[in-house]
A protein has these predicted regions:
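Bacterial Sec-dependent N-terminal signal peptides
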Residues: 2, 22-60
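N-terminal secretory signal peptides that target proteins for export/translocation
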Residues: 1-10
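Noncatalytic accessory or regulatory domains flanking protease catalytic cores in secreted, cell-surface
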Residues: 108-168
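Acidic, Ser/Thr/Pro-rich low-complexity intrinsically disordered segments
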Residues: 30-32, 71-119
Length: 399
């Protein structure tokens, strides 16, 4: 995206929050109560309002449940689930096959705090897609910052009309490090798996330096030509068919030859902040354009690796540290903010990495890449704050 769109590395977070998806270095957004006696003595099934369908993710201490809902007197669909004493994190997901906007009305923790309410402290109001509402799918991730925890006990929710609500619930010990399995895919005929290996190494190095180990599987080539160039909208039928091929227990990276239509030139985008985890569906992966990272027939491996890592950050719940205009920032308290009021030196209304040097321009989740001159001079975006690392280490599909 350094033809103007390279700066748009990642479309604006709140475009996505009202989101269609997360464009590379884009961002998209981003909150119950019963007595919990004997929680530690009972199984999750005994304590949760779940159906009989349960899926254990291979190699992970994460289980997927569909939650039974009932219609309340207020007209909302209501349900509950119980987080055991060793609960680490959860992703509560809501689906609507018609692709109309869908969201939760409330999510209340065991202490009675509605984490989706603007009046609660802290809260995920207007941060979580599960509060804002998005087409076909939305979710709430806990923790999406260290200010939240998957408190043991009964959580309750109210939701608008939907097809189903499911939860990916991770249990185990408190993580000080993490391992995440990544599955790369490549489409088109211009580049092959070998062409992205250097970028995957860059991506792996970025996460390793921040306390996260990536297990990167061999790249899978998808030869069907309809997937060479796809829309960045995850409800698009072709994009949906591509992303649905991803593995449930992995972060799926789809290196496409290019985007189609007006999306062409964008570096990449994720299905949400976070996207889906633990279920194979249309929101279970990220898209990365190879054409947007090409210089002639050669791929810019450092930039491509940063883009892949950035979009993976979105998929696991990280926002842009600073959004395009320098007036919107992420929900973490330890990431640098680059304010328009004193850093937009050229007064164009867009915060560049150069203007924000020393103020988050080098963060992996800054909204746009360094320009070509800065990259040639060795500038990189590889840093993550302690709180950003926390979100990744607690991800439901990490171990």
């Amino acid at each position: 995206m350094f033809n103007q769109k390279e700066n748009l590395k990642y479309p604006s977070l709140f475009l996505i929050c009202f989101f269609i998806s997360t464009v590379l270095f884009l961002n998209s957004c981003g909150r119950f109560m019963l007595k919990d006696d004997g929680v530690e003595k009972k199984s999750i099934e005994e304590l949760s309002g779940v159906s009989s369908v349960k899926t254990n993710l291979d190699g992970l201490k994460t289980e997927i449940f569909e939650i039974t809902q009932t219609v309340g007197s207020d007209g909302f669909l209501a349900g509950f689930f119980v987080v055991p004493e060793d609960g680490v994190s959860f992703l509560l997901s809501i689906f609507l096959g018609s692709n109309y906007n869908i969201k939760f009305y409330s999510l209340t923790d065991p202490d009675g705090t509605d984490v989706l309410s603007a009046s609660s402290t802290p809260n995920l109001y207007e941060a979580s897609s599960g509060n804002i509402g998005t087409a076909g799918y939305a979710n709430v991730l806990v923790p999406q910052s260290p200010s939240f925890s998957a408190k043991a006990g009964t959580w309750t929710f109210k939701a608008y009309t939907n097809d189903r609500v499911s939860i990916a619930l991770r249990t185990g010990s408190t993580p000080s490090a993490a391992t995440i399995v990544v599955q790369p895919y490549i489409t088109g005929t211009t580049w092959s798996a070998g062409d992205i290996s250097a970028a995957l190494s860059v991506m792996s190095g970025i996460f390793s330096a921040n306390g996260i180990t990536l297990t990167i599987n061999s790249t899978i080539t998808i030869s069907d030509t309809q997937y060479s160039a796809v829309s960045g909208t995850f409800t698009d039928p072709t994009t949906s068919a591509l992303v649905t091929q991803g593995s449930a227990a992995k972060v799926n990276l789809f290196f496409i030859e290019d985007y189609s239509g007006s999306w062409s030139g964008i570096l990449g985008n994720a299905a949400g902040i976070p996207g889906s985890m633990g279920i194979a569906n249309s929101w279970n992966g990220v898209l990365i354009s190879l054409s947007a990272h090409a210089s002639g027939a050669t791929l810019k491996s450092q930039l491509l690796g940063e883009t892949a890592a950035h979009e993976m950050g979105h998929q696991l719940g990280l926002f842009h540290t600073t959004e395009t205009g320098g007036t919107v920032f992420d929900i973490l308290t330890d990431t640098a903010e680059c304010l328009n009021s004193n850093k937009d030196f050229d007064r164009n209304g867009k915060m560049s990495a150069e203007e924000c040097e020393g103020y988050g321009g080098d963060n992996l989740m800054f909204w746009t890449a360094w320009n070509s001159s800065s990259r040639s001079a060795g500038k990189k975006q590889e840093t993550l704050s302690n709180h950003q690392q926390h979100v990744l280490k607690y991800a439901p599909i990490a171990k």
